[in-house]
Design a protein with these regions (language model features):
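N-terminal subdomain of nucleotide-sugar transferases
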Residues: 1-52, 94
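Active-site proximal beta-strand in glycosyltransferases
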Residues: 3-4, 98-100, 113-131
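Generic beta-sheet signal
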Residues: 6, 46, 66, 123-125
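A short, histidine- and acid-enriched strand-loop-helix "catalytic/donor-clamping" loop
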Residues: 12, 72-73, 107, 120-134
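Membrane-proximal helix-turn-helix segments that form the acceptor-binding/catalytic region
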Residues: 30-34, 90, 128, 133-134
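Short, charged/polar "capping" segments at the starts of alpha-helices
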Residues: 51-55, 130-132
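A short, charged, and often flexible helix/loop element on the N-terminal side
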Residues: 56-90
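Short N-terminal targeting/anchoring amphipathic segment
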Residues: 89-108, 119-122
Length: 134
């Protein structure tokens, strides 16, 4: 199975100033994608560019980093807006069997669903991130 995982916020930043981590290999989404990979599936992980690690890393699956736009309104630490989501999913929807996107309130989840409603699952993490908007 070929899986696309769209998770712009790779780790929770408690402030608007996102401190870039050296690696994403300790994140939940990395482990999530690694599990799919270890089960023999082809995985592509999409993250927001502000969360791209400071050190160059190699991964056993493809990782794409997309630019977050309109950052004054759609702040990357709480409501990242990556317009590339819609166009990429629309263009490549036939290549993927499953599209998993994170957060029900995400603009990227909406775009993925609009481009491929029959393949998109929206996964919502009920953790610290929800309180950022308060």
């Amino acid at each position: 199975m070929k899986v696309l995982v769209i998770n712009p916020i790779m780790y929770t930043s408690e402030t608007k100033n996102i401190k870039r981590a050296a690696s994403i290999k300790d994140t939940m989404m990395y482990d999530f994608c690694l599990a799919f990979h270890e089960m023999g599936h082809s995985v592509t992980l999409v993250g927001g560019e502000p969360f791209k690690p400071t050190k160059s890393e190699t991964y056993p699956f493809e990782v794409l980093w997309w630019e977050c736009k309109c950052q004054k309104v759609c702040m990357p630490h709480c409501l990242p807006f990556m317009p590339e989501t819609y166009w990429y999913v629309k263009k490549h929807r036939t290549e993927y069997d499953l599209i998993i996107t994170s957060e029900v309130f995400s603009l990227n989840s909406l775009m993925a669903y609009r481009a491929a409603p029959d393949k998109t699952i929206i996964w919502h993490e009920l953790a610290k991130h929800n309180a950022i908007m308060k």
